[in-house]
Amino acid sequence: MAKEWGYADHNGPDHWHEFYPIAKGDNQSPIELHTKDINHDPSLKAWTASYDPGSAKTILNNGRTCRVVFDDTYDRSMLRGGPLTAPYRLRQFHLHWGSSDDHGSEHTVDGVKYAAELHLVHWNPKYNTYGGALKQPDGIAVVGVFLKIGREKGEFQLFLDALDKIKTKGKEAPFTNFDPSCLFPTCRDYWTYRGSFTTPPCEECIVWLLLKEPITVSSDQVAKLRSLFSSAENEPPVPLVRNWRPPQPLKGRVVRASFK
């Protein structure tokens, strides 16, 4: 079944193209960042996020990640600037992580794998609907934040505490009054390139903003992500401990840096 993709050997990233041919396309994500090959582009502006904490609605476990969903029916929580030519609406954020602290991020920087990677997914309302934006090369903007291991991050704990309500696949719970900009690093420097979703159908519609500076969370906090299950409540328990796609070929794309 096409919709039964996952991260196991039989349905994992190596098989996605069998059902979703674009997964072998020319603009796939994630990628390896080699900083010596990336040039500073002085035309790249600063970016800003103005998020309404009341637009957060629910948190859910879809068996592949945990996701927080936002009200995107109007311009409530917006991303502006950077490489973007228009304001984009926040729709959801989710994370990718690994089975241990030494890996889990999808993008890598000079060979460094971080413990996890946060993706904030926004869409361009000039295309009227999210579905319409998925069909456009600049329809979606994703801010990627790396998580490294160190001291605990209190703001991240607010989110983690809600995971107890969505332990198993298919669970959903109210989750509001949360401003995800509290999960951004102090430094707003970023790399940008044209890419895709890192999960099927792997549509090539994304302007990526990858933040150079990781945020620091504790080992226990990342372990909390691994306490989720990819199985439903009535099924034999399968821990959700590996949900990252490996880097894809750059195929001539240019990565630009907002900083020197």
From Swiss-Prot:
The modification Phosphothreonine is found at residues 73, 129, 176, 216. Zn(2+) binds at residues 94, 96, 119. One of its GO terms (biological process) is response to bacterium. The modification N-acetylalanine is found at residue 2. One of its GO terms (molecular function) is nickel cation binding. GO terms for cellular component: cytoplasm; cytosol. SMART domains: Carb_anhydrase. This is Carbonic anhydrase 3. The gene is CA3.
